[in-house]
Amino acid sequence: MKNLTLVFGLVVSLFFLSCKENTTAQQIKLISPEEVYDAVRDNQNLQLVDVRTKDEFGEDHLKTAQNICVTDDDFKEKVAKLDKNEPIYVYCRSGKRSSNAAKILKEMGFKEIYDMEGGFLNWESQGLQEKN
């Protein structure tokens, strides 16, 4: 009976340990425009991607952003050139397309993905600088 209790306890423990969230797995973190502003201010070389169309990007964008449109056929090909081991920040107009882009990046193996909550509209409503 003692052995049965011990085995049962071990099985239950292993079950709960296997259910624990893997903290090293890729995660998508929704962050505020202020957090993006701080990241850009602290590191001008960070991977900041505006996933809107070329026309939207041409109207206005964050100063150090590169434009890789998530709806373009070659989106995956272009982002594959970025460093998967470095943090990547994505944004769009309101947050929908960047959320989709973040999911694609996660599937592609990017380790640290930040999605700006509310997109460029939220950035503008906060009155933040660092725009082009």
What are these regions (language model features)?
Residues 48-50:
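Structural scaffold elements adjacent to functional motifs in cytosolic proteins
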Residues 2-9, 16-39, 45-46, 55-87, ...:
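Rhodanese-like catalytic fold shared by cysteine-dependent sulfurtransferases
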